[in-house]
C-alpha cells in the first residue's frame, strides 16, 4: 500500500502565500520547531497543505536564507557541481550555504543553462572532431621515387706513361720483336710484287717464303735460353751474336727479284 495523503485537500487555499500566512507560519515554527508537517497546518490554523508549509519555510521563511542575486563565484560553483552531480539540486544547495535547491534550480533553468549550452555544444563538436581525427588512420606518404643511375662503361683509360725498362729479360726481347715486325712487313711487300710470282703446274701463285716459321724457330731458341736468367746474364756474347744474325735476316728485295727472274728456278 502507498503512503496516505497528508490532507484531503478539500477547502484548502492554493496559489501565492500572503504576508499574514508567512507571519503565522514563522511564529508557529519558532514556538514549536520544525517537523510534523502533516499536523502543522491544523495546529497553526492555516488552510494550507503540509507540503506547501514545508516548502514555504525551507525556501523562503528560514532566517539563514541568503537573499539577493547569485554572485559570479556562486555561478562557477554551480556549474562545476552540475557537471559532477547533474540535476541533484538538493545536493548542490547543500554545498552553497544560504541558497535553497529551488532557488538554484530556477536560476539554472532561467539563466545559467542558456549560457552554458552554446559552450557545451562547441566543446562537444570539438571533441567529436578530435575523436574523428584520432580514429582516422594517418595517411602514409608514398616513398620517394628512387633515382637509378645508368651504368656507363668507361671507354678510355688514362694511365701514366711508363718508361720502358732498361734492364732484364724484356729489354733483351725488344730487338727480336722489332725484327719480327720488319719481316712481316717485307713478306707483305713480296706478296704484292708481281715480279715475285712464279709459274708452277697449278698456275700462277705468289711465292711465299717461310720467314715466319724460320723466325719463330730461332725466336723459340732465344726464348728458351731466356727462361734461365742465370744463363742469359752469363753468356752476353751469344745473345749479341744472335741479334746480329737476326739483323742480317732483312732481305734485299731487289736481289730477291733478280733471283726469281732466272730461268733455272725449279
Curated annotation (Swiss-Prot):
Record's keyword terms, sorted: Activator, DNA-binding, Nucleus, Repeat, Transcription, Transcription regulation
GO MF annotation list: DNA binding
Subcellular location: Nucleus
InterPro entries, alphabetized: Homeodomain-like_sf, Myb_dom, Myb_TF_plants, SANT/Myb
Region (Disordered): 114-146
Function per UniProt: Transcription activator involved in the spatiotemporal regulation of anthocyanin biosynthesis specifically in the inner pericarp of red-fleshed kiwifruits. Functions in association with BHLH42 to activate the promoters of LDOX (ANS) and F3GT1 that encode the dedicated enzymes for anthocyanin biosynthesis.
Protein name in the entry: Transcription factor MYB123
Amino acid at each position: 500500500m502507498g503512503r496516505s495523503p497528508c490532507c484531503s485537500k478539500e477547502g484548502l487555499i492554493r496559489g501565492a502565500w500572503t504576508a499574514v500566512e508567512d507571519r503565522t507560519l514563522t511564529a508557529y515554527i519558532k514556538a514549536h520547531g520544525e517537523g510534523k508537517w502533516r499536523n502543522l497546518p491544523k495546529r497553526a490554523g492555516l488552510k494550507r497543505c503540509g507540503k506547501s508549509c514545508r516548502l514555504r519555510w525551507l525556501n523562503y521563511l528560514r532566517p539563514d536564507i541568503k537573499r539577493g542575486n547569485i554572485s559570479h563565484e556562486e555561478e562557477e560553483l554551480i556549474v562545476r557541481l552540475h557537471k559532477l552531480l547533474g540535476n541533484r539540486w538538493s545536493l548542490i544547495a547543500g554545498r552553497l550555504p544560504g541558497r535553497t535547491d529551488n532557488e538554484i534550480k530556477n536560476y539554472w533553468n532561467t539563466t545559467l543553462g542558456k549560457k552554458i549550452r552554446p559552450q557545451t555544444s562547441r566543446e562537444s563538436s570539438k571533441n567529436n572532431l578530435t575523436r574523428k581525427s584520432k580514429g582516422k588512420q594517418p595517411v602514409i606518404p608514398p616513398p620517394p621515387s628512387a633515382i637509378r643511375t645508368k651504368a656507363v662503361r668507361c671507354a678510355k683509360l688514362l694511365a701514366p706513361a711508363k718508361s720502358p725498362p732498361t734492364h732484364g729479360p724484356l729489354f733483351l726481347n725488344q730487338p727480336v720483336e722489332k725484327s719480327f715486325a720488319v719481316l712481316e712487313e717485307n713478306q707483305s711487300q713480296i706478296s704484292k710484287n708481281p715480279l715475285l710470282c712464279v709459274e708452277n703446274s697449278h698456275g700462277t701463285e705468289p711465292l711465299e717464303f717461310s720467314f715466319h716459321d724460320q723466325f719463330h724457330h730461332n725466336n723459340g731458341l732465344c726464348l728458351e735460353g731466356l727462361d734461365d736468367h742465370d744463363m742469359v746474364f752469363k753468356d752476353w756474347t751469344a745473345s749479341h751474336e744472335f741479334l746480329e744474325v737476326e739483323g742480317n735476316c732483312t732481305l734485299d728485295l731487289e736481289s730477291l727479284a733478280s733471283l726469281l727472274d732466272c730461268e733455272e728456278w725449279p
